[in-house]
Design a protein with these regions (language model features):
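Juxtamembrane helix-loop junctions of ABC transporter transmembrane domains
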Residues: 2-5, 48-52, 84-126, 130, ...
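Membrane-integrated ABC transporters
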Residues: 1-45, 63-76, 94-98, 115, ...
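Cytosolic ends of transmembrane helices, especially the final helix of ABC transmembrane type-1 domains
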Residues: 203, 232, 276, 297-333
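ABC-type nucleotide-binding domain
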Residues: 340-341, 345-601
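Loop segments that connect adjacent transmembrane helices in multi-pass transporters
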Residues: 131-132, 205-253, 346
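Conserved catalytic Walker-motif region of ABC-type ATPase nucleotide-binding domains
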Residues: 117, 240, 357-359
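Transmembrane helix-loop-helix hairpins at lipid-water interfaces of multipass membrane proteins
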Residues: 32-90, 167-197, 271-278, 282-292, ...
Length: 601
């Protein structure tokens, strides 16, 4: 990625208003408190310097016996003491508010990312470029309040600098010119190296994700068995070491150059400061300035130099942060391609005709290969339909289209004569009970694991238990120490790990949590033994008596119970019929059936 130009840097500042709106939404009271604390703090350095000047002038007068007032001197000392205490207290208060606001902002934006991600399409999550944007957005949820602190510090320092500069201008305006000349190289250097860091960070995003993935694979309960059995530890650690060493070398190269140039720029800044200091000393020796003036001006120039360096370098940091904010907002600019209907139709209850696929095709973004193509069939109301085909035939993609997790690339899907897109999307999803073959093993309680099938009913204990009974999961739950409150998985304390078949029964219970009109089961018994599979499908036949159901399975003992069977190959429909009809056709279905049956002989 090319380095950031000055124009792009200033353009990135347009992200700040949107950022401040987010911060304000996080906590208006803390944001306002932060701003007020910094405004008050901005006047204190000048006040402390000026009181210090008055103290020194009083001491000089008293030591020479040419005037002065002891009482006034101690008043000034007391005032300076109180100002110093106030400055320290305000500094600590600002740090506290920054910390609290930072934690709240991180939580607030993390929740926003989760909420926005929930609105996006499934196929977007299957795109690597999307994951890069998601990863960069996640990185901005932590530490972005540093940007708020930087901007407010910028305002605070500008106000302080204005007070200090006024004193120098009255004395000699050329000192300000000297000051700017001294700090400009440091500003240019910071700007240059911040650009380099940003460009490097963006280039590293895909490899960063791979690094995190290697870290997960190398130390996870989900991968531990295969890592040991296949002796993958060296392979994973070698890859992790290669990537981390590469990051280290790239970052080190920039850090070393930045340090060397930074040292040179610091020397130039010191030369400017001491040139001004020598000038002020000569003026004091010649009697044109008092000792108090000397300390005030020298202190003002020193602080001005520090403030100006901070303001200029912080500008690069602020603009840099604003550029990173673009990554954050870019994620929120991603919108779902599945648009809800403006005037949605209510979902039919009950379904009268069924679902009709009219020349439906689907392919993933940036892919030339069609996952499904030329699909023409009807899933009738109350029908039990099975999908059969080899891996990659497009079976799971088809049911995702049916549940409107995907939008057809071509053609359309009708429900009772109306395009599926005309129905209320939330109502449609509420009427679909689905369990995919890659179901999630939630590291939660049994009750929560089942309730995710209809989270609105998470407090409905009787519904959860009934769903478990329908999937035959209740028998295994009763054997667990904590019953329905037993934590599952080994990620947290006191969790119990289940077998593959037991997890599948828990997952199957989720599909029964909804009184859905359409039930989709994708390899629902793949991990079950023969007896358990038979019992599950006996129960399944009873429970789906008046419902429409789609079943995906490689087991012909399972699919033969369906009213009709669709055979898919390379994403296209090649055969349709009942088990007996398809055997009589002696086509692809019959070939696969006899091939599997031969294995049992």
């Amino acid at each position: 990625m090319p380095d950031i130009t000055i124009k792009e840097r200033f353009s990135a500042l347009s992200n700040l208003p949107r950022f401040f709106k987010l911060v304000w939404q996080t906590s208006p009271s803390l944001t306002l408190t932060n701003a007020l604390l910094r405004i008050i703090r901005s006047a204190l350095p000048v006040a402390i310097l000026y009181v210090g000047k008055l103290i020194i002038d009083q001491i000089v007068l008293l030591s020479r016996g040419t005037g002065g007032d002891h009482y006034h001197l101690w008043q000034l000392v007391t005032i300076e003491f109180l100002l110093a205490i106030l400055s320290d207290a305000l500094s600590r208060a600002t740090t506290l508010v920054d910390s609290l606001l930072g934690d709240l902002f991180s939580n607030h934006t993390s929740i926003q990312i989760m909420e926005h991600a929930a609105t996006l399409d499934l196929d977007q999550f299957e795109d690597s470029e999307f994951y890069d944007k998601l990863e960069r957005a996640r990185q901005q949820t932590v530490g972005r309040t540093v940007l708020l602190s930087q901007v407010l510090s910028q305002v605070q320092d500008i106000i302080t600098m204005a007070f200090l500069a006024a004193g120098l201008v009255v004395f000699n305006p050329w000192l300000l010119v000297l000051l700017f000349i001294a700090v400009l190289p440091a500003f240019a250097g910071e700007s240059y190296f911040n650009d380099k860091n940003y460009s490097l960070t963006r280039r590293q995003t895909p490899e960063r994700r791979e690094l995190d993935y290697m870290r997960f694979l190398g130390a996870s309960d989900e991968t531990a068995k295969e890592v040991k059995i296949f002796n993958l530890s060296d392979f994973l650690t070698d890859r992790f070491r290669f990537l981390s060493d590469k990051f280290y070398k790239d970052n080190k190269q920039i850090a070393v150059k930045r340090s060397l140039w930074g040292t040179l720029f610091a020397i130039l800044g010191s030369l400017g400061y001491y040139a001004a200091y020598v000038f002020i000393i000569f003026k004091t020796i010649n009697g044109k300035l008092s000792i108090g003036d000397l300390t005030f001006l020298a202190g003002s120039f020193r602080q001005l130099r520090s403030l100006l360096e901070g303001i200029l370098s912080r500008f690069t940091a602020v603009s840099q942060g604003a550029i990173y904010l673009k990554d954050f907002f870019d994620f929120f600019n991603i919108k779902s391609k599945i648009k809800p209907s403006v005037n949605p139709l209510p979902f039919p209850n009950p379904i009268k005709e069924g679902f009709t696929f009219e020349n439906v095709g689907f392919r993933y973004a940036n892919s030339e290969r069609w996952a499904n193509r030329h699909l023409n069939f009807t899933l009738y109301a109350g029908e039990k339909l099975a999908l059969v085909g080899e891996n990659g035939a497009g079976k799971t993609t088809l049911v995702k289209l049916l549940a409107r997790l995907y939008e057809p690339t071509e053609g359309r899907i009708l429900l009772d004569g109306h395009d599926l897109g005309e129905y209320d999307l939330e109502e449609l999803r509420a009427q679909v009970g689905v369990i995919f073959q890659d179901y999630i093993r939630y590291q939660m309680t049994v009750s929560q694991n089942i309730a995710v099938g209809n989270i609105a009913e998470k407090g409905n204990e009787s519904l959860i238990i009934n769903s478990a009974k329908q999937s035959l999961a209740d028998i295994l739950v009763q054997r667990l120490p904590g019953k329905y409150e037993q934590a599952l998985g080994k990620r947290f304390n006191n969790g119990v790990e289940l077998s593959g078949g037991e997890w599948q029964k828990i997952a199957l219970a989720r599909a029964y949590m909804k009184n859905a009109q359409l039930l989709i089961l994708d390899e629902p018994t793949a991990a079950l033994d023969a007896r358990a599979e038979y019992e599950v499908f006996q129960r399944f036949s009873e429970l789906t008596k008046d419902k429409t159901a789609v079943l995906i399975s490689h087991r012909f003992s399972t699919v033969r119970m369906a009213d009709r069977i669709l055979v898919l190959e390379k994403g296209q429909l090649i055969e349709v019929g009942s088990h007996e009809e398809l055997l009589q056709k002696n086509g692809r279905y019959a070939e696969l059936f006899y091939l599997q049956a031969k294995g049992y002989q």
